[in-house]
Amino acid sequence: MSDFPSWHIVGDWFDNCSCAVPCPCTFAQAPDNGFCESVLFWHVREGYYGDVKLDNLSFVRVGRWEGDLWARQATVVAGLYIDDHADDRQMEALPMIIGGRAGGFPGWVNECFAGGRKSRGIERAQITYEIAPDLGHWGVDIIGKVKAWAKAIGGPTSPPGKYPQLINAPGSETGPGPQVVTWGKSTILSVDAHGFKFEYTLNSAKHIPFDWVGP
């Protein structure tokens, strides 16, 4: 990894996918029905890639994988959208990180796709997102392409304003460490982007912070 500069990004991640609640992937299990169709979202609050600042940038991955990711038996096809206010250097840096080429936790995840990875491209897009301060809801829109929103799960025995969370997740999608998973359920998941077209409601969603360094 000596050909890559040092980098560090910190922020929020959430997903909205085809699996039932709770998502088995977070427990290091194979996805429901052997596949996962999903929207993955990242917002970088602070970050850099060498001398390229990455503060306040968002990106969205739409795709499908088949097989058990954590058993390193998965195959994935995906496309990426990056904030339309990213400049050319930022557009080059973010795919290096998320694609795993620049190491860190994404590099480790890249090795889990032993069946292969296929990219359907990278595009700029106007990305609108919201994450409630209390993590009661979260979501992202890319007009005409992606709509993925969720609410944190509550129930008859939940204290008001308190949502189910998990620590020490065996399959945390943002890696090992002190990350806290907040469980949610989708209110809408609609994708017509990068050749994917799918819709789900009342399926799995979750929010997890991330703090990644590399290479």
Residue ranges, per PLM feature:
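Low-complexity, flexible helical/coil segments
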Residues: D51-S58, G115-R120, P176-V180
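Short amphipathic beta-strand and strand-loop transition segments with alternating hydrophobic
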Residues: C25, V62-W65, A125-A132
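Charged linear interaction tracts used for macromolecular binding and regulation
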Residues: V76-L166, S172
